[in-house]
Amino acid sequence: MPDDRSDLREAADELDAAREEAADAEVADRLESLAERVREMTETQRRPDHGQLDRLTHDIREVEAQLDGEAVAAAGSALAHVRAYRETVEGV
C-alpha cells in the first residue's frame, strides 16, 4: 500500500494556523508541540499506527476545547485530516 502522508502534512499546517490564532500562550505552545509531533510522523520511515493516531486525536481534541473562533476551525480541520489518514492505516 502506498504511503501518502499528505493528510498528516495538512494536519500539521492546520495546527500551525490554530497556534497563530490562539489567544493563550500555553495553548499556543501545545499546538506548536502537536504540529511538530505530526511533522515527525511524516518524516519517519515507519507509518504511525492506530495507537499513535488515537493519542494524537485525543490530544488535539483536548487542546481544541480551549480554543475559540478561527483556532477552533483550524483544529477541527487538523482532526479531520488525521482521521482521513487513519482510514488508510491497516489494522484495527
Residue ranges and their predicted role:
Residues M1-V92:
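Acidic, polar-rich N-terminal leader regions of halophilic archaeal proteins
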